[in-house]
Amino acid sequence: TLISDISSKAIGQSISIVAHSMGGLVVRDTMRLHWDNWNQFISRKDSRVILLGTPWMGSHLIMQVFTGHLSRVRQLNLLDTHHTKEELIRVFNAYPGLYDLLPVPKGSDSFETPEFWEQINSELNSDKIQIPPLLDYFKKYKNEIQSFKPNLDNLYYLAGKDDLTTCAYRIRKTIFGKKLQYLGTPEGDGSVTWSLGIPKNLPAERIYFAHNTEHGNLANDEKLFEGIRDLLT
């Protein structure tokens, strides 16, 4: 693995990782799939891992991709004159990495079951929401993440802040019929809620908040650089 290669070359040196968003899931999978290499790395003197807005246990925003409600999906649909929105969603649904971003905590929605998606269509009296084809893959992945007990030694989390972050959904009655509505919480960075992003059991003294920086700018906001540098030293 890359981390073992770097570790073998950086003899006697500390190694630190700053991972933004999904990069933190690469860190988590390195922990999970290369446990021995990870423990050798993180036990090095002064080694650190800083996660910037990582969706550690997923993001509710991803359901909006599958249902076609995410603003980026709608924008792509406007720009792409050769494919319908349904065709675009069918392309997105084929990428396993997208499923890796769905919420996975115990007690979360049963995204891994066809019945979950069928129920939404039933309540909307519609068939527009596609049943994602890789649900078996996601079910296996979800079970693996739920059973994984990570080593959080020397790991820090920097959470951003935005006005609202998608945290749930509901079926709402309107004069035009029933509509799928997404709900937001102020406790999030615009893409990832704090409750899903911040790893459970991470000590409070290793959790930091950037109250004026949203998700996409956590690695770009120069006002944060000095604080990140301090955590690395």
Residue locations for each model-derived region?
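Active-site catalytic motif of lipid deacylating hydrolases and related acyltransferases
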Residues: 1-13
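Glycine- and acidic
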Residues: 15-16, 210
